[in-house]
Amino acid sequence: MSDVTTAEFNEEGKYLRKIRSFVLREGRLTKGQAQAIEAHWPTMGLDYTPEAIDLVKIFGREADTVLEIGFGMGGSLVEMAAAAPELNYIGIEVHKPGVGACLGVAGEAKVTNLRVYHHDAMEVLEHSIADGSLSRVQLFFPDPWHKKRHHKRRIVQAEFAELIRRKLKLGGVFHMATDWENYSEHMLEVMNLAPGYKNQSPTGTVVERPDHRPLTKFEARGHRLGHGVWDIMFERIS
């Protein structure tokens, strides 16, 4: 049994920490995912500790570090890491099958610049990531909680924006992407009010998908069906 914090927010965007217990059910893993964790966790896995990690020690070098929150099955994260070997990548995912899938793909791709957490992202950010240490934070296709009464559960809220700002270097970028237009409007509303940020869009709205974010199969299918995807990038300026 593991205690993991999950995020919830009140109407003002105030972060409410709640402790939830859940069982990591090994049976949910495919054989390949379980084997990938066994094979690659010793070199790519990061066990949660409440102290700030030493990035130079973990990666064996000094380099700009990109952190992705909720990488799903990890395919695009591995693709990014493989395409930019000069950068360090950290992924956080709470669902163990996704961690196993990511490690499997990373092992096949032989990437050496990727580390992953199997833990709650809020707790990792609060305690394990030093302030001013990240060049980019990525939040791609988070749960939109599309019902209005559930909007308070959306991860992009005022306190979350401030937490990300603290973890970014000056000039670092918070990059969000969503396929829900209403959530993109919510993201822009929160980020435009967040101090210390500047929207990288020349129009003050969304940006074109940057080259560093791969086009997923799901997204490509959505484009063919006429569905939109909105990328939002804010730079830390103070």
Curated annotation (Swiss-Prot):
GO terms for molecular function: tRNA (guanine(46)-N7)-methyltransferase activity. It comes from the Bacteria. The keyword Zinc does not apply. InterPro entries: SAM-dependent_MTases_sf (IPR029063), tRNA_(Gua-N-7)_MeTrfase_Trmb (IPR003358), tRNA_methyltr_TrmB_bact (IPR055361). Substrate binds at K147, D179, T216, K217, F218, E219. Keywords: Methyltransferase, S-adenosyl-L-methionine, Transferase, tRNA processing. One of its GO terms (cellular component) is tRNA methyltransferase complex. Belongs to the class I-like SAM-binding methyltransferase superfamily. TrmB family. This is tRNA (guanine-N(7)-)-methyltransferase. It comes from Shewanella denitrificans (strain OS217 / ATCC BAA-1090 / DSM 15013).
